[in-house]
Regions:
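Extracytoplasmic gate region of multi-pass secondary transporters
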Residues: 22-23, 213-254, 258-260
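Interfacial helix-cap and linker-helix signal at transmembrane-aqueous boundaries
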Residues: 29-30, 61-62, 146-154, 239-240, ...
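Helix-to-loop junctions at the C-terminal end of transmembrane segments
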Residues: 54-66, 263-275, 360
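Structural signature of the two symmetry-related core transmembrane helices
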Residues: 69-83, 278-292
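Cytoplasmic helix-loop-helix junction between adjacent transmembrane helices
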Residues: 99-135
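Helix-loop-helix hairpin linking two adjacent transmembrane segments in secondary transporters
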Residues: 131-180
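Juxtamembrane intracellular "pre-TM" segments in multi-pass secondary transporters
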Residues: 182-216
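A late C-terminal transmembrane helix in Major Facilitator Superfamily
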Residues: 327-362
Length: 404
């Protein structure tokens, strides 16, 4: 489990710290930094666009770069930026730094997908990818630990420094792992297509539109973005609208993080042993049932919704990438995963815009969660189609090149 553990730590740095630590520390940073609500909104928008840009860039040109070197470079870059955040006071420089961290996070995950798809044994890939993607949940937990322990004792600046130093440690561990990493042995049914075959940039979007697996992967990510991003953005506001205790939101998000920390390994094993369709059915059904219970009685079933969210969101990325890799080379899987991240962001943007419109016109968020529940049922429907579909894997053989 060395590979998924190391890459899970990369996710802690790139996503847990790079994407979410600022939001966790912002209440403490505002005491020393004059930053307006408008500037915070700008940071949110630009980081989202940067994440999409990084994912798109990876999908278009990532196959021309060495993913091993690129993974190390993004780790060094992210760690340096995290250390810089402890010294920044200018809102413009903070915005620029967070924007670069978001783009780096997208590229980092794409590199992880390619390396695991190429170097892990076929029967372990979904487990490894799901464990790695669940590193974000561990990042959530560590952010909370920084707030509870480091900030009271050493201040918010020390939290950024701890995150940056941890990132440098992860870079060293990643380099040590990649140094001796070799491609997985060929499967018995291997055919003539090389495992590192890339989809030409001019044909990438045609492939996604015209080929079932690539299209379904992007549709899944679109719907996941449409449901999860509005859920996370509006949940606490909705609980407040219902005059429920503020602590309920905290307990719900603790449930999300705790579930995500273990869901990757369990659901990844399920995907490798019982098939990706089965694993997708389990996680999407859990998410949909949690939302159904939540809209019936938000106060009673908020934790159930949090459990379903954690069960689905964190391991989903690894399971989908593992499923795509059954049909495409490791490099093509990285390219498609990059476009999947773009569709996820587009889905989240559409979901939040629709949620804002519904709240503006009705004065309530109640109908928003009905829409999210309906969309979650579409995810279940997609899982059923995949479960019943042809699971034949395209034959591939490993390349002669190493991780670098």
């Amino acid at each position: 489990m060395r590979m998924p553990t190391t890459f899970g730590m990369n996710q802690i740095v790139s996503h847990g710290f790079g994407m979410f630590l600022f939001a966790a520390l912002m209440p403490f940073m505002r005491e020393a930094i004059e930053i307006s609500a408008w500037q915070l909104a700008t940071i949110g928008a630009l980081t989202q666009l940067a994440y999409l840009g990084g994912a798109m860039l990876l999908g278009l040109v990532g196959h021309r770069l060495g993913t091993g070197r690129l993974a190390l470079l993004t780790g060094i870059f992210s760690s340096a930026l995290l250390l810089c955040m402890s010294q920044l006071r200018d809102p413009l420089l903070i915005t620029l730094t967070l924007t670069c961290l978001a783009a780096s996070a997208a590229i980092s995950w794409g590199c992880i997908v390619e390396i695991v798809s190429r170097c892990a044994r076929a029967e372990q890939r979904s487990t490894y990818l799901s464990c790695a993607s669940s590193g974000t949940a561990w990042g959530y937990a560590l952010n909370g630990l920084l707030i509870l322990v480091v900030v009271p004792l050493l201040g918010w600046q020390a939290s950024w420094q701890v995150a940056g130093l941890f990132g440098l440690l992860v870079v060293a561990l990643t380099w040590h792992m990649l140094r001796d990493l070799k491609s997985a042995p060929a499967c018995p049914t291997a055919g003539p297509a090389p495992v590192d075959a890339a989809i030409p940039t001019s044909k990438l979007f045609a492939t996604i539109i015209g080929e079932r697996t690539a299209l379904f992967a992007c549709l899944i990510c679109l719907l996941v973005g449409f449901t999860t991003m509005p859920f996370s953005y509006w949940l606490n506001t909705y609980l407040d609208e219902l005059s429920l205790p503020a602590a309920l939101g905290g307990y719900t998000w603790a449930t999300v993080g705790g579930t995500g920390m273990v869901a990757g390994f369990i659901t990844g094993k399920l995907a490798d042993r019982r098939g990706h369709g089965t694993a997708l059915m389990v996680i999407f059904s859990g998410f949909a049932l949690g939302l159904l219970a939540f809209i019936l009685d938000p106060g009673r079933f908020a934790l159930v919704a949090g459990f379903g969210y954690g069960l689905m969101y964190f391991p989903m990325w690894g399971i989908v990438a593992g499923w795509v890799n059954q049909h495409y080379s490791s490099t093509a899987t990285m390219q498609i995963s990059g476009i999947c991240m773009v569709t996820f962001g587009l889905g989240g943007t559409l979901g939040n815009l629709l949620a804002g419109y519904i709240r503006e016109t009705t004065g309530s968020l109640h109908d928003v969660f009905f829409v999210l529940t309906a969309a979650s049922l579409l995810l279940v429907a997609l899982a059923i189609v995949i479960l019943r579909g042809n699971r034949k894997v395209l034959p591939i053989i490993p390349p002669t090149a190493g991780a670098f």
